[in-house]
Amino acid sequence: MNCYRFKTILTNAFLLFFIISFNPSFGAENNRGNVTDERVINSPAEEPGSWLTYGQNFKEQRFSELTQINTDTIDQLGLAWTKQIGDYNMRMQGTPIVVDGVMYVTNGWSVIYALDATTGEEIWNYDPEVDKSSIRLACCGPAHNRGAAVYEGKVFVGTFDGRLIAVDANTGQEVWDVDTWIPEGLGRFNITGAPRAAAGKVYIGQGSGESGHRRGYVTAYDANTGEVDWRFFLVPGDPNQPFEHPEMELAAQTWGGEWWKYGGGGTAWNSLVYDEEFNSLYIGVGNGAPWPREIRSPGGGDDLFLSAIVSVDVDTGRMNWYYQTTPGDNWDYSSAMDMALGEIEFGGEQRKVVLQAPKNGFFYVIDREDGELLRALPYTEGIDWATHVDMETGRPVENPDVVYESEPQWIMPANSGAHNWEPQSWDNELGLMYFYYHDIANFYSLDEGFVETGEYEIRERGLSLGWGEGEYRRRLIEEADPRPESQAYVGAFDPITGGYKWRHELESDYNGGVVATRGGLLFHPEGTGELSVRDTENGEVLWRYKAPGTFRSTSVMTYQVGNSQYVATMMNGNRAIDLGGTVLVFKLNGDIELPIPEIVQAEVPELPDDDFGVAQISEGDDLYHAQCASCHGGIGIPNEVAIVAPDLRLMNLNTHSEMADIVIGGSRAERGMPEFEDTITPSQLESIRAFVVEQARRLKEFQEQNQEAIESAANEEALNRA
């Protein structure tokens, strides 16, 4: 070898060694996202300050061993930094992931941000350029995303238009991009859940079950290449065609009618949990579609695998076992809520279990090895649809007096569930689950057309729920008993005894998830815009932070970098508050302030003088609630529930004149308002406008009659926020 060249190589090697040795950030910046299976498994003991996966680690207990912020120091907590990564036209539902001092977080349109976890300074962002027209597929409002996965140097995100993307954790550059949609006879869908990554694979499901012709499945992709490793379907397809795998032949025996023409639902839109001890992936399966089983599966049975927890082998994709929480789902009672893995003493021995509080109101403790049901006790008194779970059969006993097919009525829980996706926190030492739930009733009835003709037609675009809508629904409600009162609670629940160590009422019916810590604290962002910190011993509030937005349907987590513990949550805006999409991070002695935005008053502008007929308004009522309400809200929805798309009652004359260009022509598609040219005709659009104008006139009349009370409430709100 040339001597000079050898000396040069040697000199450069020493120089590189010097740089790496005395500049720790050098290695970190070139090795971001270094998350492996072994690291995640060991993280509870070796790095409790990290938050490496959606649920903190593979067990997804979301319980932190950090103690710097505790019952003695909580009064020193303050806002450390903020970062606006979205706006009020999206929902911020993601859980930040923190790896080696970098926070990875997503906004509603699936944009990934890598931030310095101590300052909020942006390192990079990746925009997947989601097709904004995908908003038409959403069941539940504007664009939202529950977070990313970080694994082996990559960041993975499921996009709102149905793709799975891998991004280089160092640079933010795209590595691969795959479309998760199977086009054969199935409609497109959204992805809103966070992917999970483990055992060399990335796992993702999908949502949009209510949009018609949707059939749930989970796909495992090779983490390096994006190639499909296996796919597990959750609802059987056409029995006249070959089944994709043996489990579908089993499932098809439990369905009736021509379910495959509807799709069936069963999407895995949220919870996927990897268990390295049993080499399994637990899938939380969603509701049936349409909702009423009399429409979806007449003469059927359990309709597997709707509303179930399914365990599959991560190597083969074949099923180990399943447990169905709501056989023959009839109420939109998904089992897609978060699951936690734990260990409990049961029958004198330690059992490895999966724990879940799904929508239906019962809390389930299931053996992870074989799917044996160990406990199924109610976590709420607000259960009408069933009396109890029979432990001999493992099945809920449906209440014979609560049959909405023959008698439309209010039923608890509502389709939103007693507990929805908002994260829980499991203290494995104490055997307590901390979570928020609410008792809310919804009015259930069959679709008017189905009642009259026995036929139900799936909408190609818009929601296909199968229940009564519009004027028909309102007429039934007027004839029914009054709606039961709603109430929300947060508590510490013992799933073995079925009792609460403590439980407290909440001011808002809609709130965020929780995280508990070994410091004796429970952090809970509430729908009122308050981050409440409670004593885990008794649930008493020790500290509150009042934000200018709302924490409805969001999450919270905690992490440590260096010698400082942090708490992070996501703030949403709404129609009344022109602010949203903001990460809020707190630490001891944090001293920054978040600016208070101006409250936007909902004043009805000058209205068109069109004269619409009763029939046209009624048609518009049905069309509006089928095509518009999931984003713009049902008429009368209050601002505090964070429906953030514009209130159409407040359209000015110019917008009325441009409505055809907007809705049919797609002139605002880039702003998130898709075109409906293939769904809504010009005459139907005019009927929708007729309904909106009629509702705007009613609102304007109400405002004029109650002006003094409205001004007083606005002044009080301003004082509370000052």
Give the positions of each predicted feature.
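Blade-level signature of beta-propeller repeat domains, shared across WD40, Kelch, NHL, RCC1
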Residues: M557-A602
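Electrostatic cytochrome c docking/interface patches
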Residues: E38, I599-L623, A718-A722
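C-terminal capping alpha-helices of c-type cytochrome domains
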Residues: G158, Q616, S657, E677-E717
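Gly/Gly-Pro-rich "capping" loops immediately C-terminal to redox-active cysteine motifs
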Residues: G633-R668, E675
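Sequence/structural segment immediately N-terminal to covalent heme-attachment motifs in c-type
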Residues: V614-I635, S657-G665, N720-A722
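Repeat-blade elements of multi-bladed beta-propeller folds
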Residues: W51-G55, R91-V111, L137-R163, R188-S211, ...
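Extracytoplasmic beta-rich repeat domains
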Residues: K83-T95, N125-A149, E174-A194, F233-S271, ...
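Blade/loop signatures of beta-propeller domains
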Residues: E29-L79, D238-M248, R395-P400, E478-A480, ...
